Curated annotation (Swiss-Prot):
Residues 1-27 form the signal peptide. PANTHER family: PROTEIN RALF-LIKE 15-RELATED, PROTEIN RALF-LIKE 16-RELATED. It holds the Pfam family RALF. Keywords: Disulfide bond, Hormone, Secreted, Signal. Its main location: secreted. This is Protein RALF-like 20. GO terms for molecular function: hormone activity. It comes from the Eukaryota. The keyword Disulfide bond applies. Disulfide bonds join 43-51, 63-69. Belongs to the plant rapid alkalinization factor (RALF) family.
Amino acid sequence: MVLSKKTIMQSFALMIILSIVMSTTEAKTIGNPAMREDEPKGCPPGSPASCKMQPANPYKPGCEASQRCRGT
């Protein structure tokens, strides 16, 4: 099995290109602010005590007409 000179040169060029691309890639990490769970979102980092967490969707029980609830 003989490889042609063209195939060898293409393989060599591909290895060089891949090594350049891999060396210039920088990995991005998740910082600590994204992992803070003890502070509410949208509060200043220096004074989280000044913020009060509001429920996103307060509970409201539903009522169907067959249950004869008030207001229906």
